[in-house]
């Protein structure tokens, strides 16, 4: 079984450590591979195709090269956090103007739909991850440090960072249901497992090693249940 993990920096394994964004070795595809290796009955190869700062526009552009031409059995698609983000330097320069997310919601959903359709046409099973939760207070502190406090009024007027993140996640869930594809609700898994401060790094959006571990375990559980269901059908 060949699995490609396709997404942005959360797939790549970026975390905010000691004041810097770093790629950590404890990323979710690496730990997922470890979990498969420990379990008898699984012969799985997990490939990390995460790229820092990617959004659904960029994923769509590299879909053929990074996924379809690799001929995996499954593609785990994780995207949305950068789509619903804003160009904070522009917001800081013009806090009284209207600003749109980097990838507007309708285009984001259409991109995800296109990715799913192309994967299915290539005989690849798509599995969509929900958006992991963020920590709005720490994220606001992080972007304010980079872009200035002039964005605070704009954020308050537009409903706050968590408003956009939640909106995109709810819309993604609705689309997944409409498409009838598999979903792994990593957002709920992280919220119910423990304190989010342990799972989200100091920039408020990227995960810690512990957070990536929870992500991996939830994904591994999905494949375990999938395997059990196949065995039951063969009895």
For each of these PLM feature ranges, what is it?
Residues 1-52, 57, 62-71, 75:
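Serine-esterase "nucleophile elbow" of acetyl-processing enzymes
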Residues 31-34, 42, 61-235:
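Alpha-helical cap/lid subdomain in secreted, periplasmic
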